[in-house]
């Protein structure tokens, strides 16, 4: 299967020329956000516009915020790349930096989606004349509010809305003065959920193909995105009581406020009734192959990794990652998707699970 859904084409609707002229009329540097449903050609439009601007001698920055169908690797992040030469696909661009989201869907991660897009677009303005912002196809339900909040935060100078039947009106209402509605190209192809997963699997595989296992001391990095190290250690008598009550082996436990949070393994298959208002628990085996972001001192993501082992007693974590600037890692942020290095996705965890 073709790994890149979008590539450069000049077989485009006539309104693309008008959109290009509007972009050229903007005061530089400027930010242009592209929105639309899934399979409406958002990334194809980004590639086309970038090449048109580059051919006129302008520097272009691209913010790839389509976390589930990334052109700029890896998935589950928002990425910034700079382009000063013509290209055919986003996959050809070398990322400058990422913002870690930790999931392949925006659901439950609105904060990361908005902050990441805002931060990277502002960085892009420092290096380029135009910042082109690609987005997810989440435009219904809570997706309306996500897009509106993103527009409020990012403050794009122009919004390009790819729509078929005014489905984007709830999003662009109030922003009409800086919105251009564009036709969806007749050449836009639809992809099934299975095809999207296969494409993403190949992208994961490619990203991790030269990865190595790196061991980190949990005392030398900040750990975020999880409750694992919040609060204080549970006492030995509390641990023993919980183990007897629920037939668990507790490998790690914390007291967070008036609640317990434990990492456990079952020692027997028995029915359990656990009041989650008192005890939150997480299966130790689900930490294996969990995606994490490796962040620098500015909270920006150098790349991602997969947990291959964690020793709570020795306070060490082993992570498979292609990131080479390990000395710049200051923070490890836990994500909510489990994935193997061969690209096979093992499932998405709820935001509150960890």
Curated annotation (Swiss-Prot):
Keyword Cell membrane: no
GO biological process, one term: RNA processing
UniProt catalytic activity: a 5'-end dephospho-2'-deoxyribonucleoside-DNA + ATP = a 5'-end 5'-phospho-2'-deoxyribonucleoside-DNA + ADP + H(+); a 5'-end dephospho-ribonucleoside-RNA + ATP = a 5'-end 5'-phospho-ribonucleoside-RNA + ADP + H(+)
UniProt-listed Enzyme Commission number(s): 2.7.1.78
A GO term, aspect molecular function: ATP-dependent polyribonucleotide 5'-hydroxyl-kinase activity
Disulphide connectivity of cysteines: none
Cofactor or coenzyme needed: a divalent metal cation
Pfam families documented for this protein: CLP1_P (PF16575)
This protein's UniProt keywords: ATP-binding, Kinase, Nucleotide-binding, Transferase
Physiological role: Polynucleotide kinase that can phosphorylate the 5'-hydroxyl groups of both single-stranded RNA (ssRNA) and single-stranded DNA (ssDNA). Exhibits a strong preference for ssRNA.
Descriptive protein name: Polyribonucleotide 5'-hydroxyl-kinase PF0112
Source organism: Pyrococcus furiosus (strain ATCC 43587 / DSM 3638 / JCM 8422 / Vc1)
Lineage: Archaea, Methanobacteriati, Methanobacteriota, Thermococci, Thermococcales
């Amino acid at each position: 299967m073709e790994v890149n859904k979008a590539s450069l084409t000049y077989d485009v609707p006539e309104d693309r020329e008008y959109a290009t002229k509007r972009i050229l009329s903007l005061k530089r540097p400027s930010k242009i956000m592209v929105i639309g449903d899934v399979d409406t050609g958002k990334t194809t439009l980004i590639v086309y516009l970038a090449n048109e601007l580059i051919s006129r001698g302008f520097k272009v920055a691209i913010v790839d915020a389509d976390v589930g169908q990334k052109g700029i690797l890896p998935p589950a992040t928002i990425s910034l790349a700079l382009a000063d030469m013509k290209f055919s696909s986003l996959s050809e661009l070398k990322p400058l930096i990422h913002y870690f989201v930790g999931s392949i869907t925006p659901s439950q991660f609105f904060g990361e989606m908005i902050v990441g897009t805002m931060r990277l677009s502002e960085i892009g303005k420092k290096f380029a004349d135009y910042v082109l912002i690609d987005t997810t196809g989440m435009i219904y339900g809570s997706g309306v509010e996500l897009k509106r909040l993103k527009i409020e935060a990012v403050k794009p100078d122009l919004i390009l809305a790819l729509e078929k039947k005014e489905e984007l009106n709830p999003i662009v209402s109030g922003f009409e003065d800086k919105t251009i509605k564009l036709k969806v190209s007749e050449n836009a192809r639809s992809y099934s959920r299975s095809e999207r997963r296969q494409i993403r699997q190949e992208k994961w595989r490619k990203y991790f193909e030269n990865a190595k296992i790196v061991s980190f001391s949990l005392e030398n990095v900040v750990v975020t995105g999880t409750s694992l190290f919040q609060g204080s250690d549970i006492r030995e008598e509390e641990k023993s009581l919980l183990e007897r009550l629920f037939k668990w082996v507790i490998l790690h436990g914390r007291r967070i406020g008036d609640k317990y949070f434990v990492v456990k393994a079952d020692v027997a298959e028995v029915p359990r009734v656990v009041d989650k208002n008192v005890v939150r628990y997480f299966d130790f085996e689900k930490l294996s192959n969990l995606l994490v972001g490796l962040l620098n001192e500015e909270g920006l993501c150098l790349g991602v990794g997969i947990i291959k082992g964690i020793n709570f007693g020795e306070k060490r974590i082993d992570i498979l990652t292609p990131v080479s600037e390990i000395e710049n890692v200051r923070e490890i942020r836990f994500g909510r998707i489990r994935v193997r290095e061969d690209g096979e996705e093992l499932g998405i965890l709820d935001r509150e699970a960890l």
